[in-house]
Amino acid sequence: MPKSPFLLEAQARGLIFQCTDLDALDEAMLAGPITAYVGFDPTADSLHVGNALTIMALRLLQKHGHRPIALMGGGTAKIGDPSFRDEARSLITNETIAHNIAGIEKSLRQFITFSDEDPSSGAILANNADWLDKLSYINLLQDVGVHFSVSRMLGFDSVRQRLEREQGLTFLEFNYSILQSYDFRELNRRHGAVLQMGGSDQWGNIVSGIDLTRRTDGKQIFGLTTPLVTTSSGAKMGKSAKGATWVRPEKLPVFEYWQFWRNTEDADVGRFLKFFTDLPVEECERLGALEGSEINEAKKILATEATAICHGRGAAEEAAETARRVFEQGSAQAALPEIDLPANLIAEGLPAFRVFQEAGLAASGGEARRLIRGGGGRVNDVVVSDENQTFTLDDLRDGVLKVSYGKKKHILLRPV
């Protein structure tokens, strides 16, 4: 059992999947503040909920007095991380990379404090293009390449799976692990970083950086990975029919972000409260153990607390109040027409186009499909983009589905 506050709380929250030497890292953290980093791939101009666990790990690290580094992959983005991908990433331009880095920095500022706000312990924003763009290929081979075993690299799960599926791996992508390892050593030299954190898919790359630094500099550094987050039904975290659940309000309205967390499956509530909120672990466990209608209150707390971290307390409470007005017996809902729906229809799973038919917002299946394709259809205030997306009793909010078309047509479907 670790003794340092960060590792103690990280373990209690379930944030630790693997760690290279937990006892030695614990000793280092007990001795004083350390510097740790997480890398971010600038392939989009916002982070999303799929990145949230490593962001929360950085946030927790900073809470306990350690300094985070947010490393932008401005150099490695020109190659692309092949980890567990079916095909090579499309190469992106320098202009797009710069735009995306600015957006990711804005995303991170919603969660952690940077050095321009707190010089003593604020996060450092680094960009690996600052050193990778200046590398000489011959020098890289002499300095770094000599320490890498091709047979070992072929054994990385991310590489092996691509090769086993006979999808190929370019030499460009194969070099990604070498450059990420170089990053760890460089951040150790420049900023004293002794810990790299990342998702479980980054384990091989992290260990390679530790090994390189030990071989060339004789230093002990550490790696820690967070678990892969899936829902209890096996769905990948942060993905929906609409795509990624973005953290920037310019990419996704705050209310929809709140709704994402409100729609958490019952079995995931306790786990997600520990992962994605600052509530005490004991409170997370108490809320997660609630059953029946009480679990819905826990989901609202999860939604409000997770949204408050990302968008601020005021915006989170405004989203919660909007939801209360719409879904609970308040003035907004009382004014909406209600249609009874045979419960057996939705219990078996009702396709989205049928939902709009049953609500009377479309006269036929074809019209309903066209309505959805046009982007004007919403269920529970979330845009429906897949006409065959199914809705079940689990999607009810206080006993109803709110079905909307445009800004003024709203119907409540109540299974009976």
Curated annotation (Swiss-Prot):
Primary residence: cytoplasm
Binding site for L-tyrosine: 37, 176, 180
GO terms (BP aspect): tyrosyl-tRNA aminoacylation
Domain S4 RNA-binding span(s) in chain numbering: 350-416
Motif placement: 'HIGH' region: 42-51
GO cellular component: cytosol
Binding site for ATP: 239
Keyword check for Oxidoreductase: no
Enzyme Commission (EC) number: 6.1.1.1
Catalytic activity: tRNA(Tyr) + L-tyrosine + ATP = L-tyrosyl-tRNA(Tyr) + AMP + diphosphate + H(+)
UniProt KW keywords: Aminoacyl-tRNA synthetase, ATP-binding, Cytoplasm, Ligase, Nucleotide-binding, Protein biosynthesis, RNA-binding
GO terms, molecular function: ATP binding; RNA binding; tyrosine-tRNA ligase activity
Localization, UniProt: Cytoplasm
Function per UniProt: Catalyzes the attachment of tyrosine to tRNA(Tyr) in a two-step reaction: tyrosine is first activated by ATP to form Tyr-AMP and then transferred to the acceptor end of tRNA(Tyr).
Subunit structure: Homodimer.
HAMAP family: Tyr_tRNA_synth_type1 (MF_02006)
Protein name per Swiss-Prot or TrEMBL: Tyrosine--tRNA ligase
Provenance organism: Gluconobacter oxydans (strain 621H) (Gluconobacter suboxydans)
Annotated gene: tyrS
